[in-house]
Amino acid sequence: MQFVDEASIIVEAGKGGNGCLSFRREKYVPKGGPDGGDGGHGGSVYLIGDESLNTLIDFKYQRFYKAPNGQPGQGRQMSGRNGEDLHVKVPVGTTVIDEDTLEVIADVTEAGQVVLVAQAGRRGLGNIHFKSSTNRAPRKTTPGTEGERRNLRFEMKVMADVGLLGVPNAGKSTLIRAVSAAKPKVANYPFTTLVPNLGVVKLGTHEHFVMADVPGLIEGASDGAGLGLRFLKHLTRTRLLLHVVDVAPFDESDPVDSARAIAHELEQFSATLAERPRWLVLNKLDLLPEEERPSTVDDIVERLAWSGPVYKISAISGDGTQALVQAAHRWLTEQRQLEAEDETAFEHEREMRRRMEDEAVARAEARMSRKRKPAEDDDDDFDEDDYDVEVEYAP
């Protein structure tokens, strides 16, 4: 199935039914009075988080969703039927943005979470409501109100605890295959991974965490090189980043230069995401002669001026991978416990997530501005025909 992580749709709630203008007419009741019923409420549009979905591809082919209208009222004080609510399923991890106001309406982070995105129109009132001591035969009714209509943008971000970061062909997909049941495509050429992959790393019966592998970055990704930065958004929900570095690249490039380029592109995408804890994972040590490994590792760490944790692994053979995932699990457990016990740590995490959402809105606004600009430029183009004068010659 094709992976689609962005989509734009239109939702429209149902219109409320109009109130009825009617008078009671029965035998021997010449002046029965008003009996017009109320219209029905329209249907609202709701989104529901569904953990069985992992792509927004359905919204690529159906972009308009409308809830039914309420039915009009009838005589004999009969109310119109309400329009049924429309429930639209979205993948867990979907951020819902109003394209017109850029308001973040909701972040669907749990299965079964329900979000109202378009409020139904209210019913109209029948003439029975306007009867009074001075107006025994009112001819007044009210129409149903229009349902809310919205232009929505969905941005899906995978739900993961740990994210893998690195250049293409650094061994990220091999690592996630080694420590989980995920089976992403692995090959000896760059950009093998074209979409994010998730793997559940199990360390015991009830101990596990989710790892995300995203397509690799290259220098200039912030300017559109390679696959650009669009997949980095899938790391914004993670708590820990593992920077995977190939110590023996096949093109004989400098691993330090590649690592610095990735760090720069990460900062270009999100200054807040760049503040996340990041561990250095030196991969493919098995490709180096054993006597060269310590000096190579020391050289990379020293030139990067790396002060955080460093792990030396071979993803293809599995050497060092268990120590890495066990350390990551311990760190995640300690972090969650700290946030549960320390209000300052909890607020810090919430503030980081808020800042990343603000950055996401800013990126969406910039993207929409770029889309609007060509249209505005077309409108402003000078057209000589606009100033043509039609001349009619008299016979």
Swiss-Prot record:
Biological process according to GO: ribosome biogenesis
Subcellular location: Cytoplasm
Positions annotated to bind GTP: 166-173, 191-195, 213-216, 283-286, 314-316
Database matches in Pfam families: GTP1_OBG, MMR_HSR1
The protein's enzyme class: hydrolase
GO cellular component: cytoplasm
SS bond partners: none
Any one GO molecular-function label of the UniProt entry: GTPase activity
EC number(s) reported in the record: 3.6.5.-
Signal peptide: none
Domain Obg: 1-159
Region of interest (Disordered), residue spans: 128-147, 340-395
Domain of life (superkingdom): Bacteria
Compositionally biased region (Basic and acidic residues): 340-368
Keywords noted in UniProt: Cytoplasm, GTP-binding, Hydrolase, Magnesium, Metal-binding, Nucleotide-binding
Biased composition annotated in UniProt, kind: Acidic residues: 376-395
Required cofactor(s): Mg(2+)
Family: Belongs to the TRAFAC class OBG-HflX-like GTPase superfamily. OBG GTPase family.
Subunit (UniProt): Monomer.
Role: An essential GTPase which binds GTP, GDP and possibly (p)ppGpp with moderate affinity, with high nucleotide exchange rates and a fairly low GTP hydrolysis rate. Plays a role in control of the cell cycle, stress response, ribosome biogenesis and in those bacteria that undergo differentiation, in morphogenesis control.
HAMAP family the UniProt entry points to: GTPase_Obg
Listed name of the protein: GTPase Obg
